[in-house]
A protein has these predicted regions:
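Small-residue-enriched, tightly packed secondary-structure blocks
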Residues: 1-203
Length: 203
């Protein structure tokens, strides 16, 4: 199914970005994160439409410190500055507060408007942060052709992909129920995504 393939791609992106030597997302940053969104292959939506579109996964930190099962999300719009010749980028968003994650669950959430976003620090540990990074609620990591690209994501809209959630978790499934653990069978690739987050952010 397309949804399981999306989860497999998200695992691949997260793993590759975390394992990038000296250029990965600092583990101590993920340890403090309240939510993580991974959008593999965010693509240009055409010159006429402008902006971009992509589908990904979002997991939030449960009260006991573990990661929840992921909800499916979409990411659209925004005047993302794609470099010449680049058709798609992989995006990871690290939420530093619960507020932003709750906003996505409650409705549409616009990066830069509903919460400040800045290109996140890379390396083994997040030490020297810029003013923009210190103020940002969300750190973004974007990658094109395997290389990091500090692409601005302001104006991009994150929303829950209800159709995908219901296709995977069953009818009437809401993101709140997914995040609270009130789901029965979770397909393997989604479990692998959750496990990958646990592995890279063990507290």
């Amino acid at each position: 199914p397309a949804e399981e393939a999306r989860a497999e791609n998200a695992v691949r992106v997260l793993t590759e970005i975390m394992q990038a030597p000296d250029k990965g997302i600092p583990e101590n940053l993920l340890q403090k994160a309240e939510a993580v969104v991974v959008v593999p292959d965010l693509v240009k939506a055409g010159l006429v439409l402008g902006g971009s579109r992509g589908k990904g996964l979002m997991a939030v930190r449960a009260p006991d410190g573990t990661w929840t099962n992921p909800s499916f999300v979409t990411m659209t719009g925004g005047s993302i500055g794609f470099q010449a010749g680049v058709q798609g980028i992989d995006v990871v968003l690290v939420f530093r507060t619960r507020r932003g994650a709750d906003s996505v669950v409650n409705g549409k959430f616009t990066l830069g408007a509903d919460a400040s976003v800045a290109a996140g620090p890379v390396g083994r540990t997040a030490s020297a942060l810029t003013d923009a990074q210190l103020k940002a609620e969300i750190y973004s990591y974007s990658r094109a052709r395997g290389l990091f690209a500090g692409i601005a994501l302001d104006g991009s809209v994150l929303a829950i992909d209800h159709d995908a959630n219901q296709a995977v978790y069953g009818a009437d499934m809401t993101p709140r129920r997914i995040f609270s653990g009130a789901v029965g069978d979770v397909p393997g690739p989604l479990v692998v995504f959750r496990d990958a987050l646990e592995e890279h952010s063990a507290r």
